[in-house]
Amino acid sequence: IDSTKLSLFDNASTQYVNFVNSFGTSYSTLRGDASWARDTLDSRTSPTRGIVQSAYGEMGLPGGTLHYYKINYQHQWYHPLARDYTLRLNGEIGIANGLANDPLPFFKNYYAGGISSVRGFKSGTLGPKDSNGEAIGGGRRLVGNAEKYFPMPGLGQDKSIRLSAFKDIGTIVASND
């Protein structure tokens, strides 16, 4: 059971205020979780070949005050391009929504942007914004990355430090869009 207590600031987003006005500030969520992972990488620290897959599901079950679901899937693929060059492709998708006519709790929203998803953006800044211009996240997340790893000049065969060129894409969409 997850227990959550919220406090809102004076300039809180309308989305947050509306949620608190409808559902109050204290929640007890009976949460069910399930996950699965598969890893065939040839190295933990500097992979050149293999895949990593993971899936995760979370649900606010009947018996709690919040009813929702979240489903995430990630697939990473490493492939050697040449002796010292590796291609990494990564795709992530997340879908979340409220259940039983409840909205998705705003604190369960997805976020993207930043070093772990879409580099070049500040952390968590992609997607819908509130009336103050602040990111509020959403119920849909899509992220894709392509990276080419190559050796650091002067280090020879040491793969513990590599350089990379990358391209990232991603978006966050509100639950009701």
Where are the language model's segments positioned?
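C-terminal outer-membrane beta-barrel translocator/porin domains of Gram-negative envelope proteins
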Residues: 2-161, 165-169, 173-176
